[in-house]
């Protein structure tokens, strides 16, 4: 696998999603990552640290440059807990849990987050503003309502299916109400 190409494709997909989701500085972007799926295997069966590191480092660098926080979701063995910067956990009063991910409990993305983040911690849950799911890891539980599906520029990253979510405020008030425009509303 060409890791430089993987990094470039990750950057292309991410740049487009950040633009279309309208996520802003100080908000949270969640990443679900199956390096097994990227490598062409079955989720949870062929974790690959090199793939996890390339993808997480690429995304973390891009988001840090824009002041957006990254939350990296773990697998179901950790109840889909997330690695975030301690600064974010403190700022949002998130409950920190005590676990260290490994390749088969948490996965390569979480290991990479622990390597590349300044002061990483695990939290059980978060309410993110947008996210990218690489390999059908089910990030929806961590994205706030109302979730809006976004089609990534690429349908796959190597062997992994890609899906993405943004979020928008709920529309309330019914037929008499007026609404402010937003860039992701579908009507």
UniProtKB/Swiss-Prot annotation:
Record-annotated membrane-spanning stretches: none
| One Pfam assignment | DUF436
Q: Kindly give the InterPro entries that the UniProt entry links to this protein.
A: Antibiotic_NAT-like, DUF436
Q: Known SUPFAM superfamilies for this protein?
A: TTHA0583/YokD-like
Residues in the signal sequence? none
Give the top-rank taxon of the lineage listed in the UniProt record for this protein: Bacteria
- State the family named in the UniProt similarity comment for this chain: Belongs to the UPF0340 family.
What is this protein called in UniProt? UPF0340 protein SMU_87
